[in-house]
């Protein structure tokens, strides 16, 4: 018979073992066994003129040009002043996305929502005109709604102080200054807060990714410093916080495999996912492609993901074959497709007419087929690895960028696995 001391020792050891948490590498969300099929809630907590033009049209001074219209959220708030901007944005935040949208998202077979939010929701620079401190409550409510309908969430830091890319969707257009010291420090404060909060146990059943920063403009910024930021975020999450949330890093518009030597399993890292964004409308060459050329590019994009070291998801893509959507390129800039694009020294030439581009009742059967083909090819290519998140869930006026309208028009498959044009990439991979 075992002595009482031995029995007590065994009991103590069992208790200690049971009390020990599982290793982090055993607990994190497993993307290898999960195909992401999602939508972005664009134009909600970060304004984009092309998604909700009515918010910006109120500033119009004449019918001939866009003079006087703010071209991003920074200038929207600056033009209105703090009190009026707060009132208008609260109305927008409380109505643009509601619980009914999450029910609809779930009912169409999606499983994930990516929610963009700007740094200014949490902290401001001294001279910032943004409305701050209110967006977080809407984000948390959205996470609750997602949980209720069985959806997963990515929290996406979409705008950095000084802007990481100069795009209007960063909050501040036409400058790229987020790596300057003061801006950099504020952003790291915000990033630390977001990582800490949304890696807590109370969120990780639903929030399965925190994206460090949306679309840092790799060809312009200091890439070594961006890599340092990614390393710092990972170290803070894994070593300081000792938590297992997935860290999402954007590819910074670099080629596939660019981050294969950073934060890899071989280096002892885990739970890192690379976010790719694929559009084919932001150059004259792209909008001039035939449908077969567009699809060939898509198939190659899918093939490239097979060799990447990390999990990867196409976190933004669209059905757009033109850049005809009003203000897609920015307020006052025009479209490359019809030759009206003018920005600084860049101009464009006529490829085709934008008339009727967002009115499906004017489309020919061939045009409808081309859009359906393009969507189906992307669905197939991007599910070769870990999936996709469409940009975006809804817009006021445009069709090419609106998931809901595309579903209603029969251009986006329902169910999502339905194919009218199967095996388009079969010769590529």
Swiss-Prot record:
Its main location: secreted. Beta-glucanases participate in the metabolism of beta-glucan, the main structural component of the cell wall. It could also function biosynthetically as a transglycosylase. It comes from Kluyveromyces lactis (strain ATCC 8585 / CBS 2359 / DSM 70799 / NBRC 1267 / NRRL Y-1140 / WM37) (Yeast). SUPFAM superfamilies: (Trans)glycosidases. Transmembrane segments: none annotated. It catalyses: Successive hydrolysis of beta-D-glucose units from the non-reducing ends of (1->3)-beta-D-glucans, releasing alpha-glucose. Residues 20-27 form a propeptide. PANTHER family: GLUCAN 1,3-BETA-GLUCOSIDASE I_II-RELATED, GLUCAN ENDO-1,6-BETA-GLUCOSIDASE B. It is found in: Secreted. GO terms for molecular function: glucan exo-1,3-beta-glucosidase activity. It is an enzyme of class 3 (hydrolase). The active site is at residues 215, 316. Keywords: Cell wall biogenesis/degradation, Cleavage on pair of basic residues, Disulfide bond, Glycosidase, Hydrolase, Secreted, Signal, Zymogen. Its EC number is 3.2.1.58. This is Glucan 1,3-beta-glucosidase. InterPro entries: Glyco_hydro_5, Glyco_hydro_5_CS, Glycoside_hydrolase_SF, Glycosyl_hydrolase_5. Belongs to the glycosyl hydrolase 5 (cellulase A) family. It comes from the Eukaryota. GO terms for cellular component: cell surface; extracellular region. Residues 1-19 form the signal peptide. Disulfide bonds join 299-425, 324-354. GO terms for biological process: cell wall organization; glucan catabolic process.
């Amino acid at each position: 018979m075992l002595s009482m001391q031995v029995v007590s020792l065994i009991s103590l050891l069992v208790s200690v073992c049971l009390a020990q948490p599982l290793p982090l590498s055993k607990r994190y969300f497993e993307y290898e066994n999960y195909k992401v099929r999602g939508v972005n809630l664009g134009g909600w907590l970060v304004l984009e003129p092309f998604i909700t033009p009515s918010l910006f049209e109120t500033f119009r001074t004449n019918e001939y040009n866009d003079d006087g219209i703010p071209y991003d959220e920074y200038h929207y708030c600056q033009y209105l002043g703090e009190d009026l901007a707060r009132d208008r944005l609260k109305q927008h935040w409380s109505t643009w996305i509601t619980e009914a949208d999450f029910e609809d998202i779930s009912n169409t077979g999606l499983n994930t929502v990516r929610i963009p939010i700007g740094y200014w929701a949490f902290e401001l620079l001294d001279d910032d005109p943004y409305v701050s401190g209110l967006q977080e409550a809407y984000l948390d409510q959205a996470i609750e709604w997602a949980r209720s309908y069985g959806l997963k969430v990515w929290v996406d830091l979409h705008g950095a102080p000084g802007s990481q890319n100069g795009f209007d969707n960063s909050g501040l257009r036409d400058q790229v200054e987020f790596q300057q010291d003061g801006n950099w420090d504020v952003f790291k404060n915000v990033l630390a807060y977001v990582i800490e909060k949304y890696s807590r146990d109370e969120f990780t059943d639903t929030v399965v990714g925190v994206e460090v920063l949306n679309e840092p403009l790799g060809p312009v910024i200091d890439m070594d410093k961006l890599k340092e930021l990614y390393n710092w975020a990972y170290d803070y999450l894994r070593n300081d916080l000792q938590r297992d949330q997935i860290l999402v890093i954007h590819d910074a518009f670099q080629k596939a495999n660019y981050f294969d030597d950073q934060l890899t399993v071989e280096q002892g890292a885990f739970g890192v996912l690379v976010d790719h964004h694929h559009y084919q409308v932001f150059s004259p060459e792209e909008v001039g492609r035939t449908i077969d050329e567009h699809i060939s590019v898509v198939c190659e994009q899918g093939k490239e993901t097979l060799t990447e070291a990390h999990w990867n998801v196409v976190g933004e893509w669209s059905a757009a074959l033109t850049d005809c959507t009003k203000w897609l390129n920015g307020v006052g800039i025009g479209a490359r497709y019809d030759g009206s694009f003018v920005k600084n020294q860049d101009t464009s030439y006529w490829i085709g007419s934008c008339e009727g581009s967002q009115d499906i009742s004017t489309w020919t059967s061939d045009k409808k087929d081309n859009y359906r083909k393009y969507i189906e090819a992307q669905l197939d290519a991007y599910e070769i690895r870990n999936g996709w998140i469409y940009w975006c869930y809804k817009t006021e006026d445009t069709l090419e960028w609106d998931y809901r309208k595309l579903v209603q028009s029969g251009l986006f498959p329902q169910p999502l696995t339905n194919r009218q044009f199967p095996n388009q990439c079969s010769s590529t991979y």
